[in-house]
Protein backbone atom coordinates (compact mmCIF):
# COMPACT_ATOMS: atom_id res chain seq x y z
CA UNK A 1 0.00 0.00 0.00
CA UNK A 2 2.82 2.39 0.83
CA UNK A 3 4.66 3.95 -2.05
CA UNK A 4 7.99 5.76 -2.34
CA UNK A 5 6.38 8.65 -4.22
CA UNK A 6 4.44 9.64 -1.07
CA UNK A 7 7.49 9.82 1.21
CA UNK A 8 8.25 13.36 2.26
CA UNK A 9 4.81 14.61 1.18
CA UNK A 10 2.91 16.23 4.00
CA UNK A 11 -0.82 15.82 4.60
CA UNK A 12 -2.74 17.87 7.14
CA UNK A 13 -5.99 16.37 8.43
CA UNK A 14 -8.27 18.94 10.04
CA UNK A 15 -10.40 17.19 12.65
CA UNK A 16 -9.49 14.33 14.95
CA UNK A 17 -12.93 12.78 15.13
CA UNK A 18 -13.88 9.36 13.79
CA UNK A 19 -13.34 10.03 10.08
CA UNK A 20 -10.31 12.27 10.57
CA UNK A 21 -8.53 9.70 12.74
CA UNK A 22 -9.30 6.79 10.40
CA UNK A 23 -8.21 8.86 7.41
CA UNK A 24 -4.93 9.61 9.15
CA UNK A 25 -4.34 5.86 9.53
CA UNK A 26 -4.93 5.28 5.81
CA UNK A 27 -2.62 8.14 4.82
CA UNK A 28 0.12 7.23 7.29
CA UNK A 29 0.04 3.68 5.95
CA UNK A 30 0.89 5.17 2.55
CA UNK A 31 4.02 6.80 3.99
CA UNK A 32 2.67 10.36 3.94
CA UNK A 33 3.84 12.59 6.76
CA UNK A 34 0.50 13.11 8.53
CA UNK A 35 -0.44 15.83 11.01
CA UNK A 36 -3.91 15.79 12.56
CA UNK A 37 -5.15 19.04 14.09
CA UNK A 38 -8.06 18.77 16.53
CA UNK A 39 -9.71 21.79 18.16
CA UNK A 40 -10.78 19.88 21.29
CA UNK A 41 -8.53 18.55 24.01
CA UNK A 42 -7.53 14.89 23.97
CA UNK A 43 -10.70 12.95 24.84
CA UNK A 44 -8.55 10.16 26.26
CA UNK A 45 -7.55 12.38 29.17
CA UNK A 46 -10.43 14.89 29.21
CA UNK A 47 -13.18 14.91 31.82
CA UNK A 48 -16.45 13.23 30.86
CA UNK A 49 -18.49 15.39 28.55
CA UNK A 50 -22.07 14.90 27.38
CA UNK A 51 -23.53 16.18 24.16
CA UNK A 52 -23.18 14.72 20.70
CA UNK A 53 -22.98 11.04 21.60
CA UNK A 54 -25.77 9.18 19.82
CA UNK A 55 -24.64 5.57 19.89
CA UNK A 56 -23.23 4.34 16.61
CA UNK A 57 -24.33 1.40 14.49
CA UNK A 58 -21.32 -0.16 12.77
CA UNK A 59 -22.20 -2.17 9.67
CA UNK A 60 -20.41 -3.80 6.72
CA UNK A 61 -19.09 -0.65 4.99
CA UNK A 62 -17.51 0.69 8.16
CA UNK A 63 -16.09 -2.70 9.06
CA UNK A 64 -14.45 -3.03 5.65
CA UNK A 65 -12.73 0.33 6.14
CA UNK A 66 -11.50 -0.70 9.59
CA UNK A 67 -10.35 -4.03 8.19
CA UNK A 68 -8.20 -2.24 5.59
CA UNK A 69 -6.11 -0.66 8.37
CA UNK A 70 -6.12 -3.75 10.59
CA UNK A 71 -8.55 -2.45 13.22
CA UNK A 72 -11.72 -4.45 12.55
CA UNK A 73 -11.25 -7.22 15.12
CA UNK A 74 -10.24 -4.79 17.85
CA UNK A 75 -13.28 -2.55 17.31
CA UNK A 76 -15.80 -5.37 16.75
CA UNK A 77 -14.78 -6.97 20.05
CA UNK A 78 -16.01 -3.83 21.82
CA UNK A 79 -19.45 -3.77 20.19
CA UNK A 80 -22.78 -5.42 20.97
CA UNK A 81 -24.40 -7.30 18.04
CA UNK A 82 -27.93 -6.20 17.10
CA UNK A 83 -29.78 -8.72 14.92
CA UNK A 84 -33.23 -7.13 14.85
CA UNK A 85 -35.39 -4.12 15.54
CA UNK A 86 -37.52 -4.68 18.65
CA UNK A 87 -40.73 -2.68 18.28
CA UNK A 88 -42.42 -1.54 21.51
CA UNK A 89 -46.13 -0.80 21.02
CA UNK A 90 -48.07 1.57 23.25
CA UNK A 91 -49.70 -1.41 24.98
CA UNK A 92 -46.28 -2.78 25.93
CA UNK A 93 -46.32 -5.59 23.38
CA UNK A 94 -42.94 -6.27 21.75
CA UNK A 95 -42.25 -7.69 18.29
CA UNK A 96 -38.89 -8.33 16.60
CA UNK A 97 -38.15 -7.54 12.96
CA UNK A 98 -34.83 -9.15 11.89
CA UNK A 99 -32.40 -6.97 9.93
CA UNK A 100 -31.38 -9.79 7.60
CA UNK A 101 -30.66 -13.50 7.77
CA UNK A 102 -29.47 -15.23 10.95
CA UNK A 103 -25.80 -14.43 10.31
CA UNK A 104 -26.34 -10.71 9.61
CA UNK A 105 -26.19 -8.10 12.34
CA UNK A 106 -25.04 -4.56 13.02
CA UNK A 107 -22.93 -3.52 16.02
CA UNK A 108 -23.76 -1.00 18.72
CA UNK A 109 -20.54 0.96 19.31
CA UNK A 110 -19.67 3.69 21.78
CA UNK A 111 -18.62 6.84 19.89
CA UNK A 112 -16.24 7.85 22.67
CA UNK A 113 -14.47 4.48 22.91
CA UNK A 114 -14.18 4.17 19.13
CA UNK A 115 -12.68 7.65 18.83
CA UNK A 116 -10.15 6.88 21.56
CA UNK A 117 -9.09 3.65 19.82
CA UNK A 118 -8.69 5.42 16.47
CA UNK A 119 -6.57 8.21 17.97
CA UNK A 120 -4.33 5.63 19.60
CA UNK A 121 -4.05 3.84 16.26
CA UNK A 122 -2.96 7.08 14.55
CA UNK A 123 -0.22 7.62 17.11
CA UNK A 124 1.09 4.10 16.53
CA UNK A 125 2.46 5.29 13.16
CA UNK A 126 5.89 6.96 13.46
CA UNK A 127 5.02 9.31 10.58
CA UNK A 128 1.75 10.57 12.12
CA UNK A 129 1.10 13.04 14.92
CA UNK A 130 -2.06 14.41 16.54
CA UNK A 131 -2.08 18.04 17.73
CA UNK A 132 -4.86 18.75 20.24
CA UNK A 133 -6.21 22.19 21.12
CA UNK A 134 -5.39 23.54 17.65
CA UNK A 135 -8.07 25.45 15.78
CA UNK A 136 -8.03 26.32 12.08
CA UNK A 137 -8.04 30.10 11.72
CA UNK A 138 -7.39 30.62 8.00
CA UNK A 139 -7.02 28.40 4.97
CA UNK A 140 -5.61 28.97 1.47
CA UNK A 141 -6.39 25.59 -0.11
CA UNK A 142 -4.89 26.41 -3.55
CA UNK A 143 -1.48 27.00 -1.99
CA UNK A 144 -1.82 24.36 0.72
CA UNK A 145 -1.31 26.94 3.47
CA UNK A 146 -3.18 26.91 6.79
CA UNK A 147 -3.04 29.18 9.81
CA UNK A 148 -3.54 27.36 13.10
CA UNK A 149 -4.21 28.74 16.57
CA UNK A 150 -2.71 26.55 19.27
CA UNK A 151 -3.35 26.56 23.03
CA UNK A 152 -1.16 29.67 23.31
CA UNK A 153 -3.43 31.47 20.79
CA UNK A 154 -0.41 32.43 18.66
CA UNK A 155 -1.11 32.04 14.89
CA UNK A 156 1.19 29.62 13.09
CA UNK A 157 1.34 29.06 9.32
CA UNK A 158 1.63 25.49 8.06
CA UNK A 159 2.37 24.37 4.51
CA UNK A 160 1.36 20.97 3.15
CA UNK A 161 0.76 19.02 -0.07
CA UNK A 162 -2.81 18.01 0.80
CA UNK A 163 -5.49 19.35 3.15
CA UNK A 164 -8.12 16.81 4.24
CA UNK A 165 -11.17 18.45 5.81
CA UNK A 166 -12.75 16.07 8.33
CA UNK A 167 -13.95 18.76 10.72
CA UNK A 168 -17.62 17.89 10.85
CA UNK A 169 -20.95 19.35 9.81
CA UNK A 170 -19.83 22.91 10.63
CA UNK A 171 -16.54 22.48 8.76
CA UNK A 172 -14.15 25.43 8.69
CA UNK A 173 -12.34 23.92 5.69
CA UNK A 174 -15.62 23.72 3.78
CA UNK A 175 -16.42 27.33 4.71
CA UNK A 176 -13.25 28.39 2.88
CA UNK A 177 -14.16 26.27 -0.17
CA UNK A 178 -17.59 27.90 -0.25
CA UNK A 179 -15.90 31.17 -1.21
CA UNK A 180 -14.70 29.58 -4.44
CA UNK A 181 -16.77 29.78 -7.65
CA UNK A 182 -18.90 26.79 -8.71
CA UNK A 183 -19.02 25.30 -5.24
CA UNK A 184 -22.58 24.23 -4.41
CA UNK A 185 -23.78 24.00 -0.84
CA UNK A 186 -27.07 23.40 0.94
CA UNK A 187 -28.05 22.65 4.51
CA UNK A 188 -31.29 21.69 6.22
CA UNK A 189 -32.14 21.58 9.90
CA UNK A 190 -34.94 19.10 10.45
CA UNK A 191 -37.68 20.26 12.85
CA UNK A 192 -36.83 17.48 15.28
CA UNK A 193 -34.16 17.40 17.95
CA UNK A 194 -32.76 14.61 20.06
CA UNK A 195 -32.17 14.00 23.74
CA UNK A 196 -30.13 11.24 25.31
CA UNK A 197 -31.44 9.13 28.21
CA UNK A 198 -30.27 5.93 29.92
CA UNK A 199 -31.64 2.54 30.92
CA UNK A 200 -29.28 1.14 33.58
CA UNK A 201 -28.54 -2.58 34.10
CA UNK A 202 -31.06 -4.58 36.12
CA UNK A 203 -29.50 -6.86 38.74
CA UNK A 204 -26.22 -6.73 36.83
CA UNK A 205 -27.83 -7.79 33.53
CA UNK A 206 -29.51 -6.10 30.55
CA UNK A 207 -32.98 -4.80 31.43
CA UNK A 208 -34.22 -5.69 27.91
CA UNK A 209 -33.24 -8.01 25.08
CA UNK A 210 -29.58 -7.06 24.45
CA UNK A 211 -29.18 -8.06 20.79
CA UNK A 212 -31.78 -5.68 19.39
CA UNK A 213 -32.15 -2.03 18.51
CA UNK A 214 -35.25 -1.12 20.52
CA UNK A 215 -37.73 1.32 18.96
CA UNK A 216 -40.79 3.00 20.46
CA UNK A 217 -42.47 4.42 17.30
CA UNK A 218 -45.16 6.99 18.02
CA UNK A 219 -45.85 8.51 14.57
CA UNK A 220 -44.85 12.14 15.27
CA UNK A 221 -41.89 11.14 17.44
CA UNK A 222 -39.99 8.08 18.63
CA UNK A 223 -37.47 6.76 21.11
CA UNK A 224 -34.71 4.23 20.43
CA UNK A 225 -32.35 2.29 22.71
CA UNK A 226 -29.00 0.71 21.83
CA UNK A 227 -27.17 -1.75 24.09
CA UNK A 228 -23.79 -1.00 25.66
CA UNK A 229 -21.03 -3.33 26.79
CA UNK A 230 -21.66 -2.39 30.46
CA UNK A 231 -25.21 -3.88 30.25
CA UNK A 232 -26.88 -0.46 30.05
CA UNK A 233 -28.84 1.01 27.12
CA UNK A 234 -28.33 4.43 25.62
CA UNK A 235 -31.76 5.82 24.75
CA UNK A 236 -32.38 8.67 22.35
CA UNK A 237 -35.67 10.54 22.19
CA UNK A 238 -36.33 12.14 18.79
CA UNK A 239 -39.09 14.74 18.80
CA UNK A 240 -39.95 18.14 17.38
CA UNK A 241 -38.59 21.11 19.28
CA UNK A 242 -42.18 22.33 19.72
CA UNK A 243 -43.01 19.15 21.64
CA UNK A 244 -39.87 19.45 23.77
CA UNK A 245 -40.89 23.00 24.68
CA UNK A 246 -44.21 21.67 26.01
CA UNK A 247 -42.34 19.77 28.75
CA UNK A 248 -40.88 22.47 31.04
CA UNK A 249 -41.50 20.72 34.38
CA UNK A 250 -40.87 17.32 35.97
CA UNK A 251 -44.59 16.55 36.11
CA UNK A 252 -44.99 17.39 32.40
CA UNK A 253 -42.19 14.97 31.51
CA UNK A 254 -43.60 12.21 33.70
CA UNK A 255 -47.10 12.65 32.24
CA UNK A 256 -45.66 12.57 28.72
CA UNK A 257 -43.75 9.33 29.36
CA UNK A 258 -46.71 7.70 31.13
CA UNK A 259 -48.85 8.48 28.11
CA UNK A 260 -46.38 7.54 25.35
CA UNK A 261 -43.67 5.27 26.82
CA UNK A 262 -45.22 3.70 29.95
CA UNK A 263 -43.07 0.56 29.75
CA UNK A 264 -39.85 2.63 29.69
CA UNK A 265 -40.41 4.44 33.01
CA UNK A 266 -39.71 1.47 35.31
CA UNK A 267 -36.68 0.58 33.18
CA UNK A 268 -35.18 4.08 33.48
CA UNK A 269 -36.39 4.96 36.95
CA UNK A 270 -38.34 8.18 37.55
CA UNK A 271 -35.51 10.03 39.28
CA UNK A 272 -32.93 9.09 36.64
CA UNK A 273 -35.35 10.06 33.87
CA UNK A 274 -35.82 13.53 35.36
CA UNK A 275 -32.08 13.97 35.89
CA UNK A 276 -31.19 12.99 32.31
CA UNK A 277 -34.06 14.89 30.69
CA UNK A 278 -33.08 18.24 32.18
CA UNK A 279 -29.31 17.74 32.06
CA UNK A 280 -28.99 19.18 28.53
CA UNK A 281 -31.46 20.79 26.11
CA UNK A 282 -32.56 18.92 22.99
CA UNK A 283 -29.84 18.96 20.34
CA UNK A 284 -30.45 19.90 16.67
CA UNK A 285 -29.85 17.68 13.64
CA UNK A 286 -28.55 19.04 10.35
CA UNK A 287 -28.25 17.61 6.86
CA UNK A 288 -25.51 19.05 4.63
CA UNK A 289 -24.84 18.55 0.93
CA UNK A 290 -22.08 20.10 -1.14
CA UNK A 291 -20.35 19.62 -4.47
CA UNK A 292 -17.57 19.11 -5.41
CA UNK A 293 -15.75 17.49 -2.49
CA UNK A 294 -12.35 18.73 -3.65
CA UNK A 295 -10.39 21.76 -4.84
CA UNK A 296 -7.77 21.01 -7.48
CA UNK A 297 -5.16 18.60 -6.11
CA UNK A 298 -4.73 20.34 -2.78
CA UNK A 299 -7.89 19.92 -0.70
CA UNK A 300 -10.62 17.31 -0.17
CA UNK A 301 -13.60 16.99 2.19
CA UNK A 302 -14.74 13.74 3.79
CA UNK A 303 -17.28 12.58 6.36
CA UNK A 304 -19.72 15.11 7.82
CA UNK A 305 -17.68 17.98 6.37
CA UNK A 306 -18.75 16.74 2.92
CA UNK A 307 -22.14 15.19 3.69
CA UNK A 308 -23.59 15.48 7.19
CA UNK A 309 -26.68 13.27 7.35
CA UNK A 310 -29.42 12.66 9.91
CA UNK A 311 -28.85 9.47 11.94
CA UNK A 312 -31.92 7.45 11.00
CA UNK A 313 -30.30 4.88 8.71
CA UNK A 314 -27.29 4.39 10.97
CA UNK A 315 -24.97 5.20 8.07
CA UNK A 316 -23.32 8.50 9.03
CA UNK A 317 -20.16 6.91 10.39
CA UNK A 318 -20.27 4.06 7.87
CA UNK A 319 -20.53 6.48 4.94
CA UNK A 320 -17.65 8.55 6.35
CA UNK A 321 -15.49 5.46 6.84
CA UNK A 322 -16.32 4.32 3.32
CA UNK A 323 -15.14 7.74 2.07
CA UNK A 324 -11.71 6.89 3.50
CA UNK A 325 -11.75 3.42 1.95
CA UNK A 326 -12.88 4.66 -1.48
CA UNK A 327 -10.18 7.34 -1.49
CA UNK A 328 -7.58 4.73 -0.55
CA UNK A 329 -8.79 2.46 -3.37
CA UNK A 330 -8.53 5.36 -5.82
CA UNK A 331 -4.99 6.08 -4.63
CA UNK A 332 -4.14 2.46 -5.43
CA UNK A 333 -5.82 2.69 -8.81
CA UNK A 334 -4.15 5.97 -9.84
CA UNK A 335 -0.72 5.45 -8.27
CA UNK A 336 -1.11 8.11 -5.55
CA UNK A 337 -1.62 10.85 -8.17
CA UNK A 338 -3.58 13.48 -6.24
CA UNK A 339 -4.37 15.49 -9.39
CA UNK A 340 -6.39 12.50 -10.64
CA UNK A 341 -7.60 11.00 -7.35
CA UNK A 342 -9.29 14.11 -5.96
CA UNK A 343 -11.56 14.90 -8.94
CA UNK A 344 -12.31 11.19 -9.35
CA UNK A 345 -13.25 10.98 -5.66
CA UNK A 346 -15.78 13.80 -6.12
CA UNK A 347 -17.18 12.27 -9.31
CA UNK A 348 -17.50 8.82 -7.79
CA UNK A 349 -18.61 9.63 -4.28
CA UNK A 350 -21.04 12.56 -4.54
CA UNK A 351 -23.99 10.54 -5.99
CA UNK A 352 -23.58 7.95 -3.24
CA UNK A 353 -23.32 10.36 -0.33
CA UNK A 354 -26.29 12.39 -1.54
CA UNK A 355 -28.29 9.16 -1.95
CA UNK A 356 -27.67 8.00 1.63
CA UNK A 357 -28.56 11.48 2.86
CA UNK A 358 -31.96 11.23 1.18
CA UNK A 359 -32.45 7.65 2.40
CA UNK A 360 -31.74 8.74 5.97
CA UNK A 361 -34.47 11.36 5.75
CA UNK A 362 -36.89 8.75 4.37
CA UNK A 363 -36.01 6.23 7.08
CA UNK A 364 -37.03 8.58 9.87
CA UNK A 365 -40.61 8.45 8.62
CA UNK A 366 -40.40 4.66 8.35
CA UNK A 367 -38.96 4.21 11.85
CA UNK A 368 -41.40 6.43 13.72
CA UNK A 369 -44.57 5.65 11.73
CA UNK A 370 -44.43 2.72 9.29
CA UNK A 371 -42.86 -0.04 11.40
CA UNK A 372 -46.16 -0.45 13.25
CA UNK A 373 -48.25 -1.00 10.12
CA UNK A 374 -49.31 -4.41 8.82
CA UNK A 375 -48.48 -3.30 5.27
CA UNK A 376 -44.88 -2.61 6.32
CA UNK A 377 -44.61 -6.03 7.95
CA UNK A 378 -46.13 -7.67 4.86
CA UNK A 379 -43.61 -5.89 2.63
CA UNK A 380 -40.76 -7.06 4.86
CA UNK A 381 -41.96 -10.67 4.67
CA UNK A 382 -42.38 -10.41 0.90
CA UNK A 383 -38.88 -8.93 0.52
CA UNK A 384 -37.46 -11.74 2.64
CA UNK A 385 -39.31 -14.41 0.63
CA UNK A 386 -38.24 -13.01 -2.75
CA UNK A 387 -34.64 -12.61 -1.55
CA UNK A 388 -34.58 -16.25 -0.43
CA UNK A 389 -36.09 -17.29 -3.77
CA UNK A 390 -33.89 -15.07 -5.98
CA UNK A 391 -30.97 -13.83 -3.83
CA UNK A 392 -29.08 -12.11 -6.65
CA UNK A 393 -32.17 -10.47 -8.20
CA UNK A 394 -34.18 -9.23 -5.22
CA UNK A 395 -32.19 -7.73 -2.34
CA UNK A 396 -34.00 -5.78 0.41
CA UNK A 397 -32.96 -2.13 0.64
CA UNK A 398 -31.65 -2.44 4.19
CA UNK A 399 -29.56 -5.47 3.21
CA UNK A 400 -28.01 -3.54 0.31
CA UNK A 401 -27.18 -0.58 2.53
CA UNK A 402 -26.03 -2.32 5.71
CA UNK A 403 -24.60 -5.65 4.56
CA UNK A 404 -23.01 -4.98 1.16
CA UNK A 405 -20.84 -2.38 -0.56
CA UNK A 406 -23.31 -1.87 -3.39
CA UNK A 407 -22.99 1.85 -4.10
CA UNK A 408 -25.64 3.85 -2.25
CA UNK A 409 -27.13 5.43 -5.36
CA UNK A 410 -27.23 2.07 -7.14
CA UNK A 411 -29.01 0.56 -4.14
CA UNK A 412 -31.66 3.28 -4.40
CA UNK A 413 -32.15 2.69 -8.15
CA UNK A 414 -32.39 -1.05 -7.59
CA UNK A 415 -34.84 -0.55 -4.71
CA UNK A 416 -37.15 1.56 -6.91
CA UNK A 417 -36.99 -1.07 -9.68
CA UNK A 418 -37.78 -3.87 -7.22
CA UNK A 419 -40.74 -1.94 -5.81
CA UNK A 420 -42.08 -1.40 -9.33
CA UNK A 421 -41.79 -5.10 -10.18
CA UNK A 422 -43.38 -6.16 -6.89
CA UNK A 423 -46.25 -3.66 -7.23
CA UNK A 424 -46.98 -4.84 -10.78
CA UNK A 425 -46.87 -8.44 -9.61
CA UNK A 426 -49.27 -7.67 -6.77
CA UNK A 427 -51.58 -5.85 -9.22
CA UNK A 428 -51.66 -8.82 -11.59
CA UNK A 429 -52.22 -11.21 -8.69
CA UNK A 430 -54.96 -8.98 -7.32
CA UNK A 431 -56.63 -8.79 -10.74
CA UNK A 432 -56.57 -12.58 -11.11
CA UNK A 433 -58.04 -12.98 -7.64
CA UNK A 434 -60.76 -10.45 -8.45
CA UNK A 435 -61.64 -12.19 -11.75
CA UNK A 436 -61.65 -15.58 -10.06
CA UNK A 437 -63.82 -14.27 -7.24
CA UNK A 438 -66.26 -12.75 -9.74
CA UNK A 439 -66.51 -16.04 -11.63
CA UNK A 440 -67.14 -18.01 -8.42
CA UNK A 441 -69.75 -15.46 -7.34
CA UNK A 442 -71.62 -15.67 -10.66
CA UNK A 443 -71.39 -19.46 -10.63
CA UNK A 444 -72.74 -19.55 -7.08
CA UNK A 445 -75.67 -17.19 -7.71
CA UNK A 446 -76.88 -18.83 -10.95
CA UNK A 447 -77.51 -22.62 -11.03
CA UNK A 448 -77.08 -22.76 -14.81
CA UNK A 449 -74.85 -19.83 -15.79
CA UNK A 450 -73.02 -21.60 -18.58
CA UNK A 451 -76.24 -22.91 -20.18
CA UNK A 452 -77.71 -19.43 -20.14
CA UNK A 453 -74.62 -18.00 -21.80
CA UNK A 454 -74.60 -20.83 -24.35
CA UNK A 455 -78.27 -20.35 -25.28
CA UNK A 456 -77.78 -16.61 -25.55
CA UNK A 457 -74.85 -17.12 -27.89
CA UNK A 458 -76.79 -19.71 -29.98
CA UNK A 459 -79.69 -17.32 -30.45
CA UNK A 460 -77.39 -14.55 -31.58
CA UNK A 461 -75.54 -16.82 -33.99
CA UNK A 462 -78.83 -17.95 -35.54
CA UNK A 463 -79.84 -14.38 -36.13
CA UNK A 464 -76.60 -13.64 -38.01
CA UNK A 465 -76.89 -16.83 -40.05
CA UNK A 466 -80.40 -15.89 -41.19
CA UNK A 467 -79.25 -12.41 -42.18
CA UNK A 468 -77.20 -13.50 -45.20
CA UNK A 469 -77.24 -10.05 -46.75
CA UNK A 470 -75.33 -8.61 -43.79
CA UNK A 471 -71.70 -9.67 -43.55
CA UNK A 472 -68.98 -7.96 -41.57
CA UNK A 473 -66.00 -6.84 -43.60
CA UNK A 474 -62.47 -6.90 -42.23
CA UNK A 475 -59.24 -5.86 -43.91
CA UNK A 476 -58.04 -9.42 -44.43
CA UNK A 477 -61.37 -10.70 -45.99
CA UNK A 478 -60.64 -9.58 -49.57
UniProtKB/Swiss-Prot annotation:
Its cofactor is FAD. Pathway: Cofactor biosynthesis; NAD(+) biosynthesis; quinolinate from L-kynurenine: step 1/3. It is found in: Mitochondrion outer membrane. One of its GO terms (cellular component) is mitochondrial outer membrane. One of its GO terms (biological process) is NAD metabolic process. Its EC number is 1.14.13.9. One of its GO terms (molecular function) is NAD(P)H oxidase H2O2-forming activity. L-kynurenine binds at residues 85, 99, 363, 398. It is an enzyme of class 1 (oxidoreductase). Highest activity in liver and kidney. Low activity in spleen, stomach, intestinal tract, esophagus, heart and lung. The chain crosses the membrane at residues 385-404, 425-445. Increased in neuroinflammatory conditions. Inhibitors are investigated as potential neuroprotective drugs since they lead to an increased level of kynurenic acid, a neuroprotective NMDA receptor agonist. Catalyzes the hydroxylation of L-kynurenine (L-Kyn) to form 3-hydroxy-L-kynurenine (L-3OHKyn). Required for synthesis of quinolinic acid, a neurotoxic NMDA receptor antagonist and potential endogenous inhibitor of NMDA receptor signaling in axonal targeting, synaptogenesis and apoptosis during brain development. Quinolinic acid may also affect NMDA receptor signaling in pancreatic beta cells, osteoblasts, myocardial cells, and the gastrointestinal tract. Belongs to the aromatic-ring hydroxylase family. KMO subfamily. Transmembrane domains are required for enzymatic activity. This is Kynurenine 3-monooxygenase. It comes from Rattus norvegicus (Rat). The lineage of its organism: Eukaryota, Metazoa, Chordata, Craniata, Vertebrata.
Amino acid sequence: MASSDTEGKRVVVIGGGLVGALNACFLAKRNFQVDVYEAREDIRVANFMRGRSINLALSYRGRQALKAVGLEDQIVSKGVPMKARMIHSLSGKKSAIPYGNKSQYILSISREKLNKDLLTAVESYPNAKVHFGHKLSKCCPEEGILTMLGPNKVPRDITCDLIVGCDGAYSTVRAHLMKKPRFDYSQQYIPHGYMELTIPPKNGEYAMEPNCLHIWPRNAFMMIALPNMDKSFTCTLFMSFEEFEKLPTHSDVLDFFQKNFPDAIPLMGEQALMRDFFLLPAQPMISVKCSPFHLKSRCVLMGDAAHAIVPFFGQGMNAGFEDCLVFDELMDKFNNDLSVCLPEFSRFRIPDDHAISDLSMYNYIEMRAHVNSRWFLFQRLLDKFLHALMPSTFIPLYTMVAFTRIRYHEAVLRWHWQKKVINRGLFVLGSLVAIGSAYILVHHLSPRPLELLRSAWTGTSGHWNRSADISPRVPWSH
